[in-house]
Amino acid sequence: MPSLRTRREEAEMELSVPGPSPWTPAAQARVRDAPAVTHPGSAACGTPCCSDTELEAICPHYQQPDCDTRTEDKEFLHKEDIHEDLESQAEISENYAGDVSQVPELGDLCDDVSERDWGVPEGRRLPQSLSQEGDFTPAAMGLLRGPLGEKDLDCNGFDSRFSLSPNLMACQEIPTEERPHPYDMGGQSFQHSVDLTGHEGVPTAESPLICNECGKTFQGNPDLIQRQIVHTGEASFMCDDCGKTFSQNSVLKNRHRSHMSEKAYQCSECGKAFRGHSDFSRHQSHHSSERPYMCNECGKAFSQNSSLKKHQKSHMSEKPYECNECGKAFRRSSNLIQHQRIHSGEKPYVCSECGKAFRRSSNLIKHHRTHTGEKPFECGECGKAFSQSAHLRKHQRVHTGEKPYECNDCGKPFSRVSNLIKHHRVHTGEKPYKCSDCGKAFSQSSSLIQHRRIHTGEKPHVCNVCGKAFSYSSVLRKHQIIHTGEKPYRCSVCGKAFSHSSALIQHQGVHTGDKPYACHECGKTFGRSSNLILHQRVHTGEKPYECTECGKTFSQSSTLIQHQRIHNGLKPHECNQCGKAFNRSSNLIHHQKVHTGEKPYTCVECGKGFSQSSHLIQHQIIHTGERPYKCSECGKAFSQRSVLIQHQRIHTGVKPYDCAACGKAFSQRSKLIKHQLIHTRE
C-alpha cells in the first residue's frame, strides 16, 4: 500500500520539483493556506483530506445522495450497491486516453469507481477546490493534455506501457512498500520518482538555489522559476481585454485593473481619484506633514514605509562579497558577479538584431524593446505606456506628486534620484563632464553633449517645414512657431501676445520698469540681456558685422543692414505727408515731427525743445562742457561722436562721399552737399 499524503504535503512536494512549477501562484497560495485535517471516514475511504470540499472531490461515495456520511459520529456507512452497467476500466481508458481534460468527474459515472481505475494514484487526485481554470500554467496544461502516442512510458514493475504519465505513475505505486524506489540520495529511499525529485530540489542553508543567468540566489524553487522567466522573456498569462501577455500572474492582475475605468479611491483633500489603494495612500501622505516612519539608527523620519526601508539599507554594513580586483564589497553575490564584468569587459548578452552586447541580461531585454517597439508597462491613470518598469514608476509620481528624494543640504525634494544628484552639484560645485576639445567643464552630461556641437558643427534637429537645422531641440521648437504663427504667451497688463516666454518676460519689464541687466563697466541697466550684450561692445570695441561692399564694420547687425542701403540706394520708409523716403524707420519718425511740430524732448537747463532725444543729449553737453569722445591719434576731444568720426578722416584720409557728377570725393557729407551746388547752378 503506497504511503498517503495530505494536500499540503503534496503541494509542497510539487513546488520543490526542479523546473517550471505546474501550479500558478494563486493555486499555490490556496494550498498553503488550507488547514490540514483528516476526516473520520478515512479508514473507509483510504484518503486523508484537508476539508469537506476535498473530501467530495476524492471520495466518490461522499458525492452520492445515498451515501450517509453526515451521521453524528461522522462514520462512513458505505452502500454496497454498485451499478452493474458500468464500462470496464479498459473501455474508459480507451475512450478518454487522448485527452485527460475530457475524463468526467468521478461522481458523474459511479460512486464506487476508485481513483486507481482512472489511472490516478490514491492521494494524488487534484482537489475540486483547486481544479479551477487558471490554476495551472499553459506549460503544465500542455504536459497534462499531450497528444496520445507522443511518448510511451514503460513501467519497470510490469509488462505494461502507458500513453499518459498519470497511468504510469498509478502503475508504479501498486508494488508494495518493501520495494523502494531504485533512486537513493542521502540515505533516504523513495517509492515515487517525484518524491525523490522533490527531495533533491529542496534547498538547504548550505546549498541555496542559484540562477545561472545572473547569479542571484533563492531559498525556494518557485522564486528561482519566476526569476528564470524574467531572463527567458516567457509570457504565459494573457489579458482577455487587450490580448497582451505577461510572465507573472500578478502583473496580469495589475493589467486588468488598468482596464477598469472606475477610480474607487478619492482624496478628500483635493478630490483627485485613484484606481489603486497604494497610489492613493502615497498621494495622501503629501497633504500631511506627518512622518510616522523613523529610522532607529539615525532618527530620520519618512512619510512612507517604503522610503524608510530604502534608507535603512544605507546603514547595512555587512557586505560579504568582495571584488578581488578593486576591493569593492557587495551585499549579494549576484551584484559581485555583475560588477566583475566591468573589469573583465565581458558582455555575454548579445542583441540578435544589431549585435550590441550587454553585461546584464536585463539590459538586453530592455534594449530589445527598442527594435520591437514593445511598451508593456502602462500607466493606470493616463494610459501612457513605457518600455521599462522603472520609467513607469518615475512617471506615476507625476500623478501622485510623490517626491521621495530629498536634498540633505537645503531640503528640496525630487521625484527622481538623478535629478537629486544633478541638484546636489549646485552645492558642491562639481563639474565632472569635461570637453576634450577646449577643456570646459559641465555639471550635466547633456550640457556637455550640446556644447560639443559647437566644435563638431552638428545640427541634428531639423525643421520638417523648411529644412533648417539647429543644434538644440529647444531652438527648433522656438523656430517652428514662425511657421504656425502661434503666440501662446500673452501679457496680462496690455494683452500683447508673444511666441516665446522669454519675449513676454522682457516685455513685462516695460510695465514694471524692471531693468535687471546691468553693465559692470559703467553701471547702465537694461531690460533685456540682448541689449546689454550690444551695449558692452561700446566698451570692448567689438564690431563683428562687416559690409561686403566697403569693408566697414558695425557692432550690430541692424546697423549693417541700414548701412548697406547707402550702396543699394534702398529707401523703404516713405513719409505719407511729403513723400520723402528714408533708409531707416527711425529717420522717418524723426522727419514726421517736422510736419507735426512736435518737440517732446526739453532741456531742463534752458527749456529748449527738440524733436529727437539724440539732439537733446548733444545739446546738454553745451551746459556740462563734457567732451567724452577723444581722438586716439592726436588726443583732441569732441562733444559728439559723429564729429570725432569726421575728424578721424583727417588722419586716415578716407573720403567716403563721392560726387555723382564729377567723381570728386569728400570726407564729410556736408562738404559734398555744398559741392553739389556748383553743378546745380550750372
From Swiss-Prot:
SMART domains: ZnF_C2H2. Residues 1-43 are annotated as: Disordered. It comes from Homo sapiens. A zinc finger (C2H2-type) spans 209-231, 237-259, 265-287, 293-315, 321-343, 349-371, 377-399, 405-427, 433-455, 461-483, 489-511, 517-539, 545-567, 573-595, 601-623, 629-651, 657-679. Residues 268-393, 341-373, 473-503 are annotated as: Required for nuclear localization. Residues 1-10 have a biased composition (Basic and acidic residues). There is a cross-link at K253 (Glycyl lysine isopeptide (Lys-Gly) (interchain with G-Cter in SUMO2)). One of its GO terms (biological process) is cellular response to sodium dodecyl sulfate. Belongs to the krueppel C2H2-type zinc-finger protein family. Keywords: Acetylation, Activator, Cell cycle, Cell division, DNA-binding, Isopeptide bond, Metal-binding, Mitogen, Nucleus, Repeat, Transcription, Transcription regulation, Ubl conjugation, Zinc, Zinc-finger. Acts as a transcriptional activator. Promotes cell proliferation by facilitating the cell cycle phase transition from the S to G2/M phase. Involved in both the hemin- and phorbol myristate acetate (PMA)-induced erythroid and megakaryocytic differentiation, respectively. Also plays a role as an inhibitor of cell apoptosis. It is found in: Nucleus. Pfam families: zf-C2H2. Ubiquitous. Induction: Up-regulated by hemin during erythroid differentiation. Up-regulated by phorbol myristate acetate (PMA) during megakaryocytic differentiation. Up-regulated by the transcriptional activator MEF2A. Interacts with INCA1; the interaction inhibits INCA1 activity and induces the cell cycle process. The modification N6-acetyllysine is found at K487. This is Zinc finger protein 16. One of its GO terms (cellular component) is nucleoplasm. The lineage of its organism: Eukaryota, Metazoa, Chordata, Craniata, Vertebrata. Its main location: nucleus.
